Amino acid sequence: LAVTWLAMRIVRVRTPEGRIDATRVLLATNAFAAGDRRIRRRVATVRDRILVTEPLTAEQRARIGWAHRQGVYDTRTQLNYMRLIRDPAGGDRILFGGKLAYGFGDATSAPPDFERRTYESLAGAFLRTFPQLADVRFSHAWSGPIALTTRMAVHFQRYRGGDVVWAGGYSGFGVSASRFGARVGLAVLDREDRPETRLRFARELPSRIPPEPFRGLGAALTLYA
């Protein structure tokens, strides 16, 4: 993805599949735009990891007393989160995520994502949470980048007089919040006067994050405190 400013307030967006010219652009690429030096001044890219169990038997689910389908997460900085997901063949699996990690230089792709040892600490956290499920196996594991800020919430960076707006920095809470962020981001781009655009989160930016190597050190202190 490349964004170029042309004459007459035209913005050109180029991707491997083609290009488009527009007068205004909303960048909703979250962590994948954090490599831009202006955006990354306030955004760090960290990796979130997820494990999914094989389908639970009725007896296994009864062991943990998870009778309903509520999502759960703890309140630590290095939090874990979990939810039941229904398997098409029957039964429920547990999706268990957490154990954030930082890659030097805000890497959006990291070789350790494909290594078994990367997920061992997350599996340990799962077993500490559900010691009754020591006999359950994991069928899926994956990792991906999220955009982390000091505010831990979406914000809006404006460029070229507001003709380009980057909306992101959900800090791991973007699955539901990104719908709200997109709606407010479009309002910011269109310069609409709405209750949401008057709020501080839509007008002010989070604190800056220092460059490497201090960025990596700060991430380590934050994630493993």
PLM regions and their residue ranges:
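Short beta-strand segments that buttress and anchor functional surface loops
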Residues: 13-15, 169
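Short alpha-helix boundary/capping motifs
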Residues: 14, 154-155, 210-214
